[in-house]
Amino acid sequence: ENTKGQITAIDLFPKMITLLKERAIHHGLSDRISGIAVSMENLPFEPGELDLIWPEGSIYNIGFERGLREWKQFLKPGGMIAVSEVSWLTNTRPDEIEQFWNFNYAEIDTISNKIKKMEEAGYTPVAHFILPEYCWLDCFYKPMQENIPLFLEKYKNSKPAQQLVQRELDEIDYYRKYKSYYGYVFYIGMKNE
């Protein structure tokens, strides 16, 4: 609603694209918003086609460095990338949380190192900021917790489903305990000419 630009959303799951299209129609935006069910590892864009790539909370699926490198080709000269990425907020931290994240996402790193990796991938860093705590608790973990009973019911309370739920609950506990050491950081970079 706040831009006149054309937006192409991607998601691996066709159901999410269907939902996007329904919402775009509902809001009168279907002439500017389209969706494609595709993997971010196989994007269907032409070199230099896009002004902006904005993988909100998802670049970790293929890795920060790989995403920056591979997606750069799709940006026009001076095009922008805007990514949110889990990052260390301190240079030192308790072993327990370091081990947890190194096991779950080995590319976690400090903000300064993430910015350096952005530069090495051919971008000029424009800005970065730490997302507020409510983004984790209210926008991510709360809906996740609310859906746990339905998830367990859907998968008949199977052992694998229970284990997955426990991993998610452990992650929530780790965040509450160690949120001063890590968070999601929003990085904005401009493709170098």
Question: How would you name each of these model-derived features?
Answer:
Residues 106-128:
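Short alpha-helix
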Residues 86-105:
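Short, glycine-/aromatic-enriched active-site segment of Class I SAM-dependent methyltransferases
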Residues 127-193:
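Conserved Class I S-adenosyl-L-methionine
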